């Protein structure tokens, strides 16, 4: 689960297995809306205050992927690190 409060992701960095689809559960505990976004993957999810939802990431190659809260781009950053087995 990833909690977003006042434009800050907790945790703000997660590791996932490369080559597998991954479900991320998002919980917006902030007073306003959240727009979870990654342009490269064409992922965009808007959550109202107090809402809970999820996104499914595609099979990722090993590497780092950045997601933002479009409404709070300076503080709202989440780094997803896809690791191959044994890394």
Stretches with model-predicted labels:
Residues 1, 47-87:
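Extracellular/periplasmic metallocenter environments
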Residues 1-21:
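N-terminal edge beta-strand
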Residues 12-14, 42-46:
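Beta-strand-rich interaction surfaces with strong enrichment in secreted/lumenal proteins
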Residues 22, 32-34, 76:
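Short beta-strand/loop motifs in extracellular/secreted proteins, especially
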Residues 26-28:
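Asparagine-centered strand-capping/turn motif at beta-strand->loop junctions
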């Amino acid at each position: 689960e990833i909690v977003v409060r006042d434009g800050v992701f907790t945790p703000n960095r997660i590791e996932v297995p490369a080559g597998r689809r991954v479900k991320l559960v998002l919980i917006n505990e902030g007073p306003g809306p959240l727009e979870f976004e990654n342009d490269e993957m064409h992922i965009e999810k808007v959550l109202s205050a107090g809402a809970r939802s999820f996104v499914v990431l595609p099979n990722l190659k090993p590497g780092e992927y950045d997601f933002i809260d479009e409404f709070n781009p300076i503080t709202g950053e989440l780094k997803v690190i896809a690791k191959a087995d044994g890394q």
